[in-house]
Design a protein with these regions (language model features):
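Structural motif corresponding to alpha-helix initiation and N-cap regions
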Residues: 47-51, 79, 119
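Glycine-rich, charge-decorated loop segments at or immediately adjacent to ligand/cofactor-binding or catalytic sites
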Residues: 99-114
Length: 131
């Protein structure tokens, strides 16, 4: 079973949920290693507490999935999550959002692979790159 950390902002919950659908529909057996939305650290914790919670999740995961949209280049959290994944030698799977013409150079440079926005691409990347 893969332990998958999906980088996300709850502002982009639809994309996050679609990644979960891709994994479910693609037959990948996984444990969602992301920090849950209802975890109090999101609303009551400091940035440092959230960072520590994310790092604990990344440290124990098989791979990190990051949406490779251009917005990722400007997200302080995605850049921190990339640094955490690299620190703990976790493969990064970048997912190019459907219809996107450009992707984040930050994600592109850090990713082990960039996949297309579909279940087969995402699931094949997990099977190939996850530890």
């Amino acid at each position: 079973m893969y332990r998958i950390f999906i980088s996300h902002s709850w502002n982009y919950a639809n994309q996050y949920n679609k990644i979960l659908d891709f994994l479910d529909n693609g037959g990948v057996k996984y444990y969602n290693h992301s920090v849950p939305k209802d975890d109090p650290v999101h609303t009551n914790g400091s940035d440092k507490e959230l960072e520590d919670a994310i790092e604990a999740k990344v440290k124990g995961c098989s791979c990190v999935i990051i949406l490779a949209g251009v917005y990722a280049s400007y997200s302080k959290w995605i850049q921190k999550e990339i640094a955490m994944a690299q620190k703990h030698n976790k493969p990064i799977i970048g997912v190019k959002y459907w219809g996107a013409i450009r992707i984040s150079s930050v994600v592109d440079d850090a990713a082990s692979v960039i996949t297309n926005w579909n279940s087969d691409s995402v699931c094949n990347a997990v099977r190939m790159y996850a530890l």
